[in-house]
């Protein structure tokens, strides 16, 4: 089997790490399988809701950026709800909702913050994993990462969160986990979700290792991975050197996390399993839906806020120099 270095890896890899990668990739080559991918051009809304962690609330969640089905509201629970919406995804059979903490930048030394423009959101399924046993179940909800992690040692290792400058040589990260030098192209994030599920309880878990085994009583499903590209070149044209003028709505890069509620049609979810079996190829997921002529928009515009400062006020926070807010109480994982 020939070694194929994935596009997302080879364009950010320094020469000093190439040999290590080749050795690791050689051992994993026999495990590498096919994958599929869904792209969304941009979020259709930023909003201070979190249907998984704070269902129904408009005052407990920090600001998130939402991609996918616009049927999502603060109380969304099911695949059927999402499948009634309009999606920005390039596969009409994917009416899932994906969200992550809004990435913010400051151009005035922290006095104000605004969302960083998103160049592209991509949801990869099963990239580099072994074949899935079962489809992603209807109504599945998942969270990857930990919104409470304020230091690197508190991060969930299996989520494998990364921040780097796409196509640029590897550079040290700053004290907050972001690149310490401005990006010549996109600021990119990667985040892996659990790939094991109990189809009865819908509880999820990670395998014991990449390409390894699921916990007892669980089956493997196509693994979801977020790949989000942000474009800072217009809003911060001079870049930066040292501490990046960037943060997440939850804090530093260490609190990176993502949320997902499955909205794939049952037919398409079943068809996705077959795309994980052929070695090292992209395969499209087919289904019975055709692209709608619609534009995703906020389904509940009268509730919640999309402005960062207003979201901070809604949470009852106070501004601090380091991150723009400090919690009076420890928030649940989001």
Q: Which ranges hold each PLM region?
A:
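Fungal secretory targeting signals
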Residues: 1-36, 332-334
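Primary mode marks residue(s) on the alpha4-beta5-alpha5 output face of response regulator receiver
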Residues: 35-60, 65-191, 198-334
């Amino acid at each position: 089997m020939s070694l194929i270095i994935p596009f997302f890896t080879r364009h950010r890899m320094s020469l000093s790490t190439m040999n290590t990668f080749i050795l690791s990739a050689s051992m994993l080559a026999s495990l590498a399988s096919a994958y599929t991918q869904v792209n969304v051009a941009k979020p259709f809304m930023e909003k201070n809701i979190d249907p998984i962690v704070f269902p129904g609330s408009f005052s407990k969640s920090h600001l998130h950026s939402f991609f996918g089905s616009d049927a999502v509201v603060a109380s969304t629970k099911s695949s059927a709800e999402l499948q009634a919406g309009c999606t920005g995804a390039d596969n009409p059979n994917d009416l899932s909702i994906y969200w992550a903490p809004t990435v913010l930048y400051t151009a005035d030394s922290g006095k104000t913050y605004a969302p960083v423009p998103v160049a592209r959101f991509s949801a990869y399924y099963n990239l580099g994993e072994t074949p899935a046993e079962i489809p992603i179940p209807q109504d599945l909800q998942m969270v990857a990462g930990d919104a409470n992690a304020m230091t690197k040692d508190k991060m969930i290792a299996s989520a494998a969160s990364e921040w780097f400058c796409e196509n640029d040589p590897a550079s040290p990260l700053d004290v907050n986990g972001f690149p310490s030098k401005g990006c010549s192209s996109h600021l990119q994030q990667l985040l892996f979700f659990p790939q094991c599920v109990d189809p009865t309880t819908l509880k999820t878990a990670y395998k014991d290792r990449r390409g390894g085994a699921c916990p007892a009583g669980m089956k493997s499903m196509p693994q979801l991975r977020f790949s989000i590209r942000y474009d800072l070149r217009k809003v911060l044209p001079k870049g930066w050197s040292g501490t990046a003028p960037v943060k997440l709505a939850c804090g530093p890069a260490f609190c990176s996390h993502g949320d997902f509620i499955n909205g794939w049609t049952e037919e398409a979810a079943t068809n996705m399993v077959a795309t994980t079996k052929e070695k090292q190829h992209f395969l499209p997921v087919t289904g019975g839906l055709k692209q709608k002529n619609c534009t995703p928009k906020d389904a509940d515009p009268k509730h919640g806020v999309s402005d960062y400062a207003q979201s901070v006020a809604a949470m009852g926070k106070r501004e601090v120099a380091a991150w723009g807010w400090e919690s009076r109480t420890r928030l649940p994982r989001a």
